[in-house]
Amino acid sequence: MRIMARIGVENSLTDVQQALKQQGHEVVTLNSEQDAQGCDCCVVTGQDSNMMGIADASIKGSVITAHGLTTDDICQQVESRT
């Protein structure tokens, strides 16, 4: 059985949060840079390219910018990066 990832998702992306939870991932709402720690991957809106410092080296995983992507696109990117 595959171990699901811990995914940080910006709080305005509620549809993405729900979709990732349905896939079995642990979803953490990103309210501050500390919330991103321990996440395998983070999903941000892209409205602020360095949202709360998350786009820098504060996390070990990838940062996915949701701008222009559908919820399905984002979920596929999460699957390919975790």
Curated annotation (Swiss-Prot):
Pfam families per record: UPF0180 (PF03698)
Disulfide bonds: none
Family: Belongs to the UPF0180 family.
Descriptive protein name: UPF0180 protein BALH_1248
